[in-house]
């Protein structure tokens, strides 16, 4: 006794055309048993293709009940319908519907990917099926390299891949010559003898007569249902596709790899369009990374300038602030303030400063130079490095010695032929001084680093050069791990107690550092926000192109759904493509930014862009996130398509 496999009861299908409803199928009642070979025949517009689409779960009836192997179809969601197509149906289309970027072997494997078969098992079965159909020498040919008959054989092999047992053939010979058409019909008869249920949809009664049973449709109604010949002896059930079970993780991995490969193929097929789409991401990422690197570089440069003044230092000046017109008349900042400051527990070192500009002579060389009177701790406070000789000690300050320390600029100017300056006597104004040491040039200090600097004990400058008893400034270096603001307040209290009034002001280099860090961070953030606009524009471009890609590949979407792709599979495929476009754009953008940094370093010797791993990682994450956000809507649009509408899309 035959087993009912496909059962339709009262099936009606209506379509809305503008304001008018068109009924394509009218109260169809059919039962197709397991192992039957049935032909559904009718003229164009009879509803035969619509009936096949409902049979294959590619379309849903407007009314009535449809069961597949006793399972009601009407209440199933899209993923359950996809599962039904994977497990029970194989489709043979008139126009083959092969994926052009895949080989014959790859096309046949597609249903097994969505069925969760292992890679080795599906590759072996696909090769076996193609070999049985006479394509053993065409396994790695693409559809464009195959004849129509060969493409249809690949389509048949794909239909058999999951061994669902039900073959739905829509005009399988319609696009073939007579010889190829007869070969396809012969294959279908062989499949029937092997126990497969074969349903052929055709308008040609000659083709229909090859079936055991012919169902005629006219204007959406069954007008005839007859046996053409007695039932042949067939296998009780079709050959099963045996394959080892795979874990859910491996199934997901295989589907992901397939989606990844298809994304790469799609990008490669439209290389120029892909590049132009990436361009917005490339420019955006390069802009953001470069701006951050530029901001970091400028911040480090400015902080280096501050450090050149001495780390953790407080500068004490007479007056109420820079630009105070009365500052020159204030003479209360004196050498006697140094000792009390030095004795404070939070103070590391103290150096006074008094300076003047004079003409400096050595032999027949005369130059203008800045003469600074400083204490013995000046070089420690400022962080200068001794290149040669010695620094003057405390005794030089006490004894008003005429010892001098010069910088490398002064050495190069006064001793251009490489003479050793140590022990040489130079004339500073009218005061002869003996050079005892050379310190390295101050890198990154405020002002020009080409100045000629000479340092002598401040007592010598005050008594023997400028004839004044007050100081221009005092620099205090605070010990490490001491809060600068607290130290500033303590020094303020101490000097106010000594002077009786606040006739001085203090420049806190730590406050300047914090202010500059905050300012550069704000500016970097501001410019980065501007650069992010280009990323946003690039993301919109990605979304636009992905929408175009979805439209162009609508038929591919339909084919994948027909062979069992889930909604998540379709969405994943297009989402991966969008993410890859943005990720590759991000990589190219970072590379472009690094190239800009190299070029910038060649053009600027004393300033460099500083890249951080965090900004580069953030760039990759940002580009991937853009791919996900702007790729989501096109991917969702693709995943929401109805299989039949996608297949019919030109």
From Swiss-Prot:
Residues 6-244 form the ABC transporter domain. It holds the Pfam family ABC_tran. Residues 227-246 are annotated as: Disordered. Residues 233-246 have a biased composition (Low complexity). It is a multi-pass membrane protein. It is found in: Cell inner membrane. One of its GO terms (cellular component) is plasma membrane. Homodimer. Part of the tripartite efflux system MacAB-TolC, which is composed of an inner membrane transporter, MacB, a periplasmic membrane fusion protein, MacA, and an outer membrane component, TolC. The complex forms a large protein conduit and can translocate molecules across both the inner and outer membranes. Interacts with MacA. Belongs to the ABC transporter superfamily. Macrolide exporter (TC 3.A.1.122) family. This is Macrolide export ATP-binding/permease protein MacB. It comes from Pectobacterium atrosepticum (strain SCRI 1043 / ATCC BAA-672). The gene is macB.
């Amino acid at each position: 006794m035959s087993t009912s496999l496909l059962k339709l009861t009262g099936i009606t299908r209506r379509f809305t055309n503008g304001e008018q409803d068109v009924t394509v199928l009218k109260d169809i009642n059919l039962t197709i048993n397991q192992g039957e070979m049935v032909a559904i025949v009718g003229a164009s517009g009879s509803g035969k293709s619509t009936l096949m689409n409902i049979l294959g779960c590619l379309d849903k009836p407007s009314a009535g009940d449809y069961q597949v192997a006793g399972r009601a179809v009407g209440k199933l969601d899209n993923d359950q319908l996809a599962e039904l197509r994977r497990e029970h149906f194989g489709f043979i289309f008139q126009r083959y519907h092969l994926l052009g970027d895949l080989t014959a072997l790859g096309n046949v494997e597609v249903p097994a990917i969505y069925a969760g078969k292992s890679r080795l098992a599906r590759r072996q079965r696909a090769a076996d099926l193609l070999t049985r159909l006479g394509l053993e020498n065409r396994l790695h040919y693409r559809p464009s390299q195959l004849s129509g008959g060969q493409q249809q054989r690949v389509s048949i092999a794909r239909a058999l891949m999951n061994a669902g047992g039900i073959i739905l053939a829509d005009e399988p010979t319609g696009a073939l010559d007579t010889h190829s058409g007869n070969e396809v019909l012969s294959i279908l008869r062989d499949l029937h003898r092997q126990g497969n249920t074969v349903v052929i949809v055709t308008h040609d009664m000659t083709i229909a007569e090859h079936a055991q049973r012919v169902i005629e449709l006219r204007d959406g109604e069954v007008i005839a249902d007859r046996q053409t010949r007695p039932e042949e002896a067939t296998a009780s059930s079709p050959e099963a596709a045996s394959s080892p079970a795979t874990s859910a993780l491996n199934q997901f991995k295989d589907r992901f790899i397939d989606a990844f490969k298809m994304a790469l193929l799609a990008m490669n097929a439209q290389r120029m369009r892909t590049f132009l789409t990436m361009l917005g991401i490339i420019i955006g990422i390069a802009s953001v990374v470069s701006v951050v690197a530029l901001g970091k570089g400028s911040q480090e440069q400015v902080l280096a300038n501050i450090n050149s003044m001495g780390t953790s230092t407080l500068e004490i000046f007479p007056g109420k602030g820079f630009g105070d017109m009365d500052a020159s008349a204030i003479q209360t900042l004196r050498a006697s303030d140094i000792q009390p400051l030095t004795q404070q527990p939070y103070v590391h070192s103290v150096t006074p400063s008094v300076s003047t500009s004079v003409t400096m002579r050595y032999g027949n060389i005369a130059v203008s130079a800045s003469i600074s009177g400083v204490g013995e701790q000046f070089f420690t406070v400022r962080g200068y490095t001794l290149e040669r000789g010695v620094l003057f000690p405390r005794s030089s300050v006490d004894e008003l010695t005429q010892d001098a320390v010069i910088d490398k600029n002064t050495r190069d100017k006064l001793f251009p032929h490489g003479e050793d300056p140590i022990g040489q006597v130079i004339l500073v104004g009218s005061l002869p001084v003996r050079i005892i040491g050379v310190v390295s040039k101050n890198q990154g200090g405020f002002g020009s680093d080409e100045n000629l600097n000479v340092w002598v004990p401040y007592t010598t400058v005050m008594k023997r050069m400028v004839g004044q008893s007050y100081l221009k400034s005092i620099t205090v270096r605070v010990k490490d791990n001491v809060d600068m603001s607290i130290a500033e307040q303590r020094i303020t209290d101490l000097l106010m107690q000594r002077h009786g009034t606040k006739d001085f002001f203090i420049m806190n280099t730590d406050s300047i550092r914090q202010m500059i860090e905050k300012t550069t961070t704000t500016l970097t953030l501001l410019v980065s926000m501007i650069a992010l606009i280009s990323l946003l524009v690039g993301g919109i471009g990605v979304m636009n192109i992905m929408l175009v890609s979805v439209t162009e590949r609508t038929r591919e979407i339909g084919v994948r759904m027909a062979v069992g792709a889930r909604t998540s599979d379709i969405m994943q495929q297009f989402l991966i493509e969008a993410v890859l476009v943005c990720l590759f754009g991000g990589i190219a953008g970072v590379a472009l930014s690094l190239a800009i940094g190299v070029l910038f370093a060649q053009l600027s010797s004393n300033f460099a862009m500083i890249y951080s791993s965090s900004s580069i990682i953030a760039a990759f994450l940002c580009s991937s996130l853009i791919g996900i956000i702007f790729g989501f809507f096109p991917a969702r649009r693709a995943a929401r398509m109805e299989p039949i509408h996608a297949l019919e899309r030109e």
